[in-house]
Amino acid sequence: MIKYSLILLAVLLIIFWIFTSYLLKRGEAPVADGSTNYAIVLGAKVNKGSVPSRALKYRLDAAYDYAMKYPHTQLILSGGQGDDEDATESSVMKKYLMDRGVSEFQLIEENESTSTFTNIKYSMKSIPLTEKKVTIISNDFHLARAQMIADYFHLEADVVAAPTPKIIEFKVRVRERFGLIAQKIVLWFK
């Protein structure tokens, strides 16, 4: 009996892994083509000294490239201040992008959010009600859940997938698999 239980558990874990792998990969599409007027850049950890973490830097580099290619797009820099952060994620993002040459007029700060859900919820305050399409910029592992949340708020989202730093890739991809399922359950009950 124990042997069959272990086999069943192994099969269920394999199915879970394959299913969530599919969801994570599907989150990287559709690729943004500049057809939106607003792009939400999702915040991430800010290190001591108001230095963007590597994951945040990769997101910002992708946002910079997108802003240069599509200068009509307003970037909504979304992220509040965590207990262990010196500044809001949005202010660190704004400084980083302005230092690289992005116009301040192209940047909108959203500095209250503390989760992916509130990143998108609070960023919507900066988007006119007539806009139903938005671009989301984040690390590749994060986009499936971000799109799930955008869909909850009736936004059609295309994406810019920043790479995930190799040093954290395994950890965040495992965590995100459970995050996807948990987020879906939470959204069912909202």
Where are these regions (language model features)?
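N-terminal membrane-anchoring alpha-helices
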Residues: 1-35, 186
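A transmembrane-helix-recognition feature enriched in membrane-embedded lipid enzymes
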Residues: 170-189
